[in-house]
A protein has these predicted regions:
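Alpha-helical transmembrane segments and adjacent TM-loop junctions that form the membrane-embedded core
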Residues: 2-20, 39, 43, 47-203
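Hydrophobic alpha-helical transmembrane segments
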Residues: 35-36
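The first (N-terminal) embedded transmembrane alpha-helix
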Residues: 19-32
């Protein structure tokens, strides 16, 4: 059992946690987009772009955490609690746009003959990304349980989705190492586009 926090303590912990989330996302976004461009992998770049949408979401959650603690005023006589569902709705809309764009790119890649990439590099990046996402997810779940913060729960859910994306990417590309020929060569060419399309549907 966690010691019960005052509202002020919970809000301070909430903001500190969201700052950690934002800084971590910045690192993942830069790494994903930069490394994805370097090795030519759309799946890794999608991981980076998804991190960018998460950055926007976490930034909005942090802003909401600061706004919600304000007392009611003459413009908002019932306080600012309504800000949280608005932020959630906006984040879901951004995620939908990213998924549709990724699905289009993935299907286009499949249609045009795939995109062969270095499987080892993709798997290495995705394993590291999954480990980072898992660490932040576990951390935020504990903070959410202690502070009873819906904003942290929502942000933790996004980290869980990111972790799932990385795990599916690892499994999808690792199949190249276990499939017999001629399936290995075929999947090596289509794995990148196929994983992008699959993740767009799952997200």
């Amino acid at each position: 059992m966690y010691e019960k926090l005052t509202r002020k303590q919970a809000n301070r912990l909430e903001q500190q946690t969201l700052r950690v989330s934002v800084f971590t996302i910045v690192g993942l976004a830069i790494a994903g987009i930069g490394f994805g461009l370097y090795i030519g992998s759309e799946a890794v770049m999608l991981d980076g772009f998804y991190a960018l949408t998460s950055l926007l979401g976490s930034g909005l959650y942090l802003l909401a955490a600061k706004v919600v603690e304000r007392p009611a005023d003459r413009h908002f006589q019932y306080g600012y609690a309504h800000i949280e569902p608005l932020v959630n709705s906006f984040n879901n809309l951004i995620l939908l746009i990213v998924c549709l764009y990724a699905l289009f790119n993935g299907l286009e890649g499949l249609r045009t003959g795939g995109n062969p990439v270095d499987v080892g590099n993709v798997v290495l990046y995705s394993v590291l990304s999954a480990a980072v996402c898992a660490a932040v997810w576990i951390y935020e779940r504990r903070v959410a349980a202690r502070s009873d913060s819906q904003l942290i729960r929502n942000d933790a859910r996004e980290w869980m989705i990111s972790m799932g994306f990385s795990i599916v990417t690892v499994l999808g590309f690792a199949m190249v190492w276990v499939l017999p020929e001629p399936y290995r060569s075929w999947w090596a060419r289509y794995a990148d586009s196929g994983v992008v399309a699959l993740m767009a549907l799952l997200l």
